[in-house]
Amino acid sequence: LPHGRLNALILPHVIHFNAADGTAAEKYGRLAKLCGLAANPRSLAAGLNRLRAQLKLPERLSACGVEGKELTAALDGLAEAAQADLCAPSNPRPAAAEDLKSLLRELA
């Protein structure tokens, strides 16, 4: 799955996850306002979902050819790789392996 396509799918979910951090929520709200949306993380995520739909990008991994069984089999490795990524420590909210698996399951 291309990196950009996966980002288009997962970014709204990541915004919801990170918005539990007050500082991140505030920054997402400012970004939403700059985009002409209501100044909150939910509006930003919804706006990204609308943009994804306008670009005719898929909403689910299954629409990209990733089957549920395939995803389930890969979850542990994907979560481990995400936690090992050099960018992971800079995420506004620490993500445990189960958090990452949950985000991916939301995309199934």
Briefly describe each language-model feature range.
Residues 1-73:
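Gly/Pro-rich interdomain helix-loop hinge
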